[in-house]
Design a protein with these regions (language model features):
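Active-site-proximal loop/helix segment associated with metal-binding centers of metalloenzymes
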Residues: 167-172
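Double-stranded beta-helix
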Residues: 173-174, 178-186
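Catalytic alpha-helical scaffold of carbohydrate-active enzymes acting on polysaccharides/glycoconjugates
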Residues: 1-159, 184-215
């Protein structure tokens, strides 16, 4: 709710909590109501689970999957920092049998996969790649956020593989990103329909503030 720069680890923990202003707590019920019977994955920030421990329980009780995003939101491209985050959130990860991971900013490193395996994760969704791609990384599957190949379909999927000039100039349209769907809503909707008709299941993500605005 309060991280337009996509990171806020430079702020004191109490300041981060004050800035949230319990918006995350008040938003969860309206979000669950929006999705209704449609099932989704909620990738939670561990720090927020500490503030509002009822969040994963509400999500799980509503029949949705609880995933892990990070413990404190910032760029995570260092193995030591990833390990620290996994340990910091280990309690609720184990309690809710969390099996899915999504790196902040959809940007990770290859070293993440053995670390996830040690914490019993089954999959990550931390790269960008064409819909239908799934890559086995040791004991962990990488199920990327979806792109549309406008040129040649890529054949190598090694992290980091995030939304940048290299990805776009290489002919991939990252329609699974909420940034893209916010700018090109009708185009993205049409792409998703085409993917479904072709038998593929797109992976897309949205942030809470893109779904509801808490009062």
């Amino acid at each position: 709710w309060f991280a337009p720069s996509r990171r806020y680890d430079f702020l004191a923990p109490e300041t981060r909590y004050q800035l949230d202003g319990e918006r995350s707590r008040h938003a969860i019920d309206p979000i669950l109501e929006v999705f209704g019977e449609s099932k989704v994955t909620f990738y939670l920030v561990g720090e927020m689970v500490g503030w509002y421990p009822e969040l994963p329980e509400k999500i799980s009780s509503a029949g949705h999957e609880v995933g892990f995003h990070c413990h404190i939101h910032r760029r995570l491209d260092d193995a030591k920092e990833i390990k620290k985050d996994l340990i910091a959130s280990a309690g609720w990860i184990q309690k809710y049998k969390v099996r899915g991971y999504r790196a902040p900013m959809i940007n990770t490193i290859e070293e993440v996969y053995p670390l996830l395996a040690k914490h019993n994760f089954l999959y990550s969704s931390s790269q960008y790649a064409p819909a239908g791609i799934a890559v086995k990384k040791g004991d962990v599957w990488e199920i990327p956020v979806s792109t549309l190949s406008l040129l040649n379909t890529p054949t190598e999927f090694n992290a980091p593989r995030y939304m940048n000039l290299k990805l776009v100039s290489g002919g991939e349209f990252p329609y699974g990103s909420s940034f893209t769907s916010g700018l090109f809503r009708k185009t993205v909707y049409n792409i998703i329909e085409r993917e479904f008709k072709a038998g593929r299941s797109p992976v897309i993500f949205l942030h809470p503030y893109e779904i509801v605005t808490p009062k």
